[in-house]
Amino acid sequence: MKSFILSNILLGLAAAVPQYGDLSGPPKRFTIRNVSLIGSGCPSGTAHVQVDRSGTIFEASFSAYQVQTGPTVPASEWRKNCKLSLNLDYDPGFQFRLVGTDMSGFASIPDGIGGQCVNSFSFAGDNGDRIEYIVRFQGRNSGRFDLHSTPGLSSWSSCESNTSILNLNTACELEPSNHRALIAVDEVSGKLTVKCAIQWQRCLK
């Protein structure tokens, strides 16, 4: 299984660069047929996914996502995840890839405590290849966070079909501690949000 990981610095990847078709705007039709989800961070009815009108951004938001530590907090609360499978439908002759993510939420972490959130993406049937965006918290953090990441390399969806199943897994964790720490939804919006930018191109005939 290949894993392309991005942290605070961009990792260079030694790989042959394949030839693609012309980069273009999005297809006229780009919709989410359905979404299935599972995980401790997204109880039923607390996750929502939408595509913006431009067809170049989709957003996953979670309204009950909370990771915490403290003197009476059980170990099950130190780490949470939510895995979504998005069945995407669009006009034939196009393919897309992810070119960046913005993650926003709330963190309250004291000195000496570390934490991180990992957003991993893969296409169903893509030989296990995936890309991971990692947001790390180290030392004192208090308040809203809004962090942007861009990949060094990412996979394109297949040209063999005008549908794709994109898997997204959001996993956040804190180091075990008796000190109170928290990664959770933003206090204003009431959501922890992962916003993804999409690049489209026409398939080679």
What are these regions (language model features)?
Residues 131-164:
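Short, surface-exposed tryptophan/glycine-enriched loops
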Residues 87-95, 156-160, 199-201:
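Extracellular and analogous surface-interaction loops
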Residues 174-205:
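Proprotein-processing/basic-patch segments
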Residues 160-177:
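Internal, hydrophobic beta-strand segments that form the core of beta-sheet-rich folds
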Residues 78-125:
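Extracellular-facing segments of soluble proteins and assemblies that are Gly/Ser/Thr-biased and enriched
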Residues 1-18:
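Fungal secretory targeting signals
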Residues 17-73:
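N-terminal leader/pro-regions and domain N-caps
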Residues 61-69, 102-104, 169-174:
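Generic short beta-strand segments
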